[in-house]
């Protein structure tokens, strides 16, 4: 819709004004291999999109988003739209013809396709088409049976495709019906994902900007050093480095070899 497009442009303008212009160490990553050009103390910032409502069926708008530097697109939030059904849509349909066309454009542009909010049918449809696929903020459904999490079958297929899962820190997606969700509960997800062959496919997606409840000790991004410190009690330094950044760098290197 026009309203969604206007809001998208407003958010991009805020990103440019508040993130890039006011923080000299922040550099926009407009293609994935720009990460390798960052200098010491510089931080890369990436524009991503959740929900295709902003461009609808207008591929001119989609092209503009690519030109602005959007490098990851999730077709839906939890609801359905012109591209796909989200995980909250009860009918559980998959990608539309339009959604498939958008993914093909993502492939051409080396833009990631994000499956975190898709219905299960949309997930499987996406895996058939997308060259660069990941779940930006999801967990393991076997450990926490929330619809937003991925089943063992989905995770194995994602890894087989070369895709990644970035863990989400929203307590309800980590441990359902638990008043005090801890880092130990997140470790349960990491252990399980590793047992499925995901050691080289795990990252952290957090979702700090989208949640108002928190894992104890992970209330904001400033707690990442503490989180890493805690993970080192469970895993080797090499494995923790993989989870924190090495896996993702390897992933994007496969997008831009």
Q: Can you name each region flagged by the protein language model?
A:
Residues 168, 197-218:
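Short acidic/histidine-rich active-site segments
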Residues 1-168, 172-174, 187, 191-194, ...:
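Extended, charged catalytic domains and RNA/DNA-binding interfaces, predominantly
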Residues 125, 203-204, 241-245:
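Beta-strand segments within the central parallel beta-sheet cores of soluble alpha/beta enzyme folds
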Residues 219-257:
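Mid-to-C-terminal alpha-helical segments outside catalytic/metal-binding sites
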Residues 177-180, 211-218, 231-234:
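Outer-membrane beta-barrel pore domains
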């Amino acid at each position: 819709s026009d309203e969604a497009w206007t809001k998208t442009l407003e958010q991009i303008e805020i990103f440019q004004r508040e993130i890039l212009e006011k923080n000299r160490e922040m550099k926009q990553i407009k293609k994935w291999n720009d990460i390798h050009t960052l200098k010491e103390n510089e931080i890369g910032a990436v524009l991503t999109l959740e929900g295709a409502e902003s461009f609808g069926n207008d591929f001119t708008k989609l092209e503009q988003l690519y030109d602005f530097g959007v490098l990851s697109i999730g077709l839906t939030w939890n609801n359905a739209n012109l591209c796909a059904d989200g995980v909250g849509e009860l009918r559980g349909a998959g990608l539309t013809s339009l959604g498939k066309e958008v993914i093909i454009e993502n492939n051409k542009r080396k833009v990631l396709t994000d499956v975190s909010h898709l219905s299960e049918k949309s997930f499987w449809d996406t895996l058939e088409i997308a060259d660069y696929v990941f779940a930006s903020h999801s967990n393991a459904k076997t450990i926490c049976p929330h619809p937003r999490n991925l089943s063992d079958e989905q995770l194995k297929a994602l890894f087989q495709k070369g895709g990644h899962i970035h863990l989400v820190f929203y307590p309800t997606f980590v441990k359902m019906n638990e008043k005090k969700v801890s880092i130990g509960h997140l470790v349960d997800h990491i252990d399980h994902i590793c047992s499925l062959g995901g050691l080289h496919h795990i990252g952290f997606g957090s979702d700090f900007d989208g949640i108002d409840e928190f894992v104890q000790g992970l209330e904001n991004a400033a707690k990442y050093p503490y989180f890493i410190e805690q993970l080192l009690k469970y895993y080797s330094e090499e494995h923790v480095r993989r989870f924190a950044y090495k896996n993702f760098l390897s992933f994007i290197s496969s997008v831009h070899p």
